[in-house]
Amino acid sequence: MNSRLQEIRARQTLRRKLLAQQLGAESADSIGAVLNSKDEQREIAETRETSRASYDTSATVSKRKMPEEGEADEEVIEECKDAVEPQKEEENLPYREEIYKDSSTFLKGTQSLNPHNDYCQHFVDTGHRPQNFIRDVGLADRFEEYPKLRELIRLKDELISKSNTPPMYLQADLESFDLRELKSEFDVILLEPPLEEYFRETGIAANEKWWTWEDIMKLDIEGIAGSRAFVFLWCGSGEGLDFGRMCLRKWGFRRSEDICWIKTNKDNPGKTKTLDPKAIFQRTKEHCLMGIKGTVHRSTDGDFIHANVDIDLIITEEPEIGNIEKPVEIFHIIEHFCLGRRRLHLFGRDSTIRPGWLTVGPTLTNSNFNSETYASYFNTPNSPLTGCTEEIERLRPKTPPPKSDRGFGASRGGGRGGPSAGRGERGRERNRGSFRGDRGNFRGRGGPHRGVFAPR
């Protein structure tokens, strides 16, 4: 414990020295003086002088004994009374808390009690949102400090680019178009519906018809989804979260993730949108719900999914007013996660056409989709999957093996009563033929499969 405490103190001392060098302070103890602005330093100096002067005066008065009326003249008595009365008035004044109103020397990395580390106050002063200061958010520099993960991303991008189908697109009115006419099942379906709230927040008239959640729910997604598939549904920042979950349930999907898009305003601080009449605060994020259909386990279905390659956050600059396009990073997240090659993008636009995807939307200006040509890309049994290389399999994050496979089962809990006494018997339970508690193919308390089905 002492060594740990010494290590923490040493790191704290080093941190203060580095801050002193960055701020140009003489020593680590003088950081506080550098953080204060000139006006604050002047106020502090005046306060110190005033308090020192009042202290000296009170000390002088306290040392001088109040003369009695018979021992001194009236002038001395009045002088002592005038010195004591202001001191009593100051004691009776209510305490006023100092309110911090300036963040001109806003600094990251300082103590949390320091007001200069107040991101909310900095937003009030400058208009810069707190998320503007999150580091390494771009695709290029996100994994600079993680060479293995950076190499994994590079290898996966190369494999995806080689296995992608040519970009195909179809101009269609999704209100009347039957999705079953695509004559294909899809592993991934991305929906980007033009919601009413997008146009309500921007205050600009819609160039295209916006969709209600009742209309979105009528889409025949369940008819084109594969036996194991994923759906990604952009549902805005407000009431769409609840309606989005309802859509997933209606289509036969289970909600498994919530990808959050955090919008920064580095290029245009202080920019405000038209406030949603249903909202109290400005909304600076959107949600993309991910649903799963079928049985997919990251520990056993490595041929179909690679989990934990990306994070569930997208941090990019907020688009201009009137632009409802979503960040392109959502495509990278989907392609890195799901190894299925049959990808469908609904409500796509000309700017979202990309290799490996079939884009369908009412605002597309052209079409090149042919159902027979598209189906020919997936004729062989393994052709619907991108596949995987040995190097990618070695680098990708995996589920830790169960304790029984690591040799912990039989030795756990072996105690004083011998190898077969106490809880040490838990690891041997699976070697027994049957026992009275083995009901419904579930193991009892002593088995390693408590609460789950026995492996097939």
Swiss-Prot record:
Gene Ontology biological process: forebrain radial glial cell differentiation; gliogenesis; mRNA destabilization; mRNA processing; mRNA splicing, via spliceosome; RNA methylation; spermatogenesis; stem cell population maintenance
UniProt-annotated site: Interaction with METTL3, residues: Y146, D242, R245, R298
Keywords, alphabetical: Differentiation, Nucleus, RNA-binding, Spermatogenesis
Source domain of life: Eukaryota
Biased composition (Polar residues): 52-61
Transmembrane segments: none
PROSITE patterns: MT_A70, SAM_MTA70L_2
Pfam families per the UniProt record, alphabetical: MT-A70
Major location category of this protein: nucleus
Biased composition (Basic and acidic residues): 39-51, 423-441
UniProt-recorded Gene Ontology molecular function terms: mRNA binding; mRNA m(6)A methyltransferase activity
Region (Interaction with METTL3): 135-136, 237-238, 255-258, 278-287, 308-312
Stretch list, region Positively charged region required for RNA-binding: 245-254, 297-298
Listed Gly residues bias regions: 410-421
One cellular component term from this protein's GO annotations in UniProt: RNA N6-methyladenosine methyltransferase complex
Region ranges (Disordered): 39-74, 395-456
Subcellular location, record wording: Nucleus
S-S bridge residues: none
Recorded family membership: Belongs to the MT-A70-like family.
Subunit text: Heterodimer; heterodimerizes with mettl3 to form an antiparallel heterodimer that constitutes an active methyltransferase. Component of the WMM complex, a N6-methyltransferase complex composed of a catalytic subcomplex, named MAC, and of an associated subcomplex, named MACOM. The MAC subcomplex is composed of mettl3 and mettl14.
Function, as annotated: The METTL3-METTL14 heterodimer forms a N6-methyltransferase complex that methylates adenosine residues at the N(6) position of some mRNAs and regulates the circadian clock, differentiation of embryonic stem cells and cortical neurogenesis. In the heterodimer formed with mettl3, mettl14 constitutes the RNA-binding scaffold that recognizes the substrate rather than the catalytic core. N6-methyladenosine (m6A), which takes place at the 5'-[AG]GAC-3' consensus sites of some mRNAs, plays a role in mRNA stability and processing.
Entry protein name: N(6)-adenosine-methyltransferase non-catalytic subunit METTL14
Organism: Xenopus tropicalis (Western clawed frog)
Lineage, highest ranks first: Eukaryota, Metazoa, Chordata, Craniata, Vertebrata
Gene: mettl14
